[in-house]
């Protein structure tokens, strides 16, 4: 059992924290409301190719969940959730390796609101993204912006040659802007 270091919260946009891991990294979305939020991880490979790992409910493809045994070495846990403390909702992505990834983009999507065209913010969801590494790093970025939009680009992970930086992005976007600004996001918009 890994004993985590004290949690570090990145509160300001572009604030960053270094971390390492050697085979097990958990990225969790936790939130208090009953809103159906989706955790997604999009990425740019070192060769410039874009991809993503997200719920298979978007395109009805099991492969969208990813894999820990082969590239991308990232797996969205789907409905297999770890129990949470405090009765919070949880979605989780596990990462075995980021060796081939240059940058990972961690986003939340309020899919139902996007489909219905509702104006929404993330301020009342009580959300945050937590990152826990097997090197005992424990980082969090709050997802509580009052800006309107269906996509919340919470943070990014930058690969710095085996050391990593978690960067607070705190950027709320509409679907079209996310499509244009987040590499790999277009995957959930297409079959």
Question: What residue ranges belong to the model's regions?
Answer:
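Intrinsic-disorder/low-complexity signal
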Residues: 1-191
